[in-house]
Amino acid sequence: DLFKGGVKKYTDEELKAILANDQTPVFVAVAPSANDGNDAEHNADSPATDQVLGYAFCVFQQHLNSNILTDIKTLYIDDLCVDERSRGHHVGSTLYRYVLDFARQSGCHNVTLNVWACNPKAQAFYERMGLTPYYIGMEQVL
């Protein structure tokens, strides 16, 4: 397995720096509060009020004065995650569309991300959202 278990992706210090930086926007999907104007009845399967359902960590990228790359502004999604209990309830698609709208309003040419080849569900999700491959990273394990 490539990933360590039981560890956080960011330290507390890294997270504070990310949240304080305009170049690394973070978006969080939370369960609606009881007084959000929705008359739908709360049931045991509904998430608790203000519970985090998902998040997207993003980074603005721009390759200025590159010999080979055009000077386009990109919003790179470093991490998009939805709580396992909230998957299948359109949290990811709503969050992704919000990020897409933010990127458009910020003057970005495109939105990019990386997805692990060992995660076909994520690949299928991103394809449903309209993303297409533009770079393929390869490796040979020694």
Locate predicted features.
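Conserved GNAT-fold acetyl-CoA-binding loop/helix
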Residues: 1-17
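A short helix-loop-beta-strand connector motif used in the catalytic cores of GNAT acetyltransferases and
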Residues: 16-28, 76
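Conserved beta-strand in the GNAT
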Residues: 28, 50-60, 76, 81
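Conserved acetyl-CoA binding element of GNAT-fold acetyltransferases
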Residues: 70-84, 139
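Conserved acetyl-CoA-binding loop-helix of GNAT-fold acetyltransferases
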Residues: 82, 88-101, 128
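Conserved active-site alpha-helix within GNAT-family acetyltransferase domains
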Residues: 93, 105, 117-135
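Conserved GNAT acetyl-CoA-binding A-motif
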Residues: 104-114
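Conserved beta-strand-loop-alpha-helix junction that forms the acyl-donor binding cleft
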Residues: 112-122, 139-142
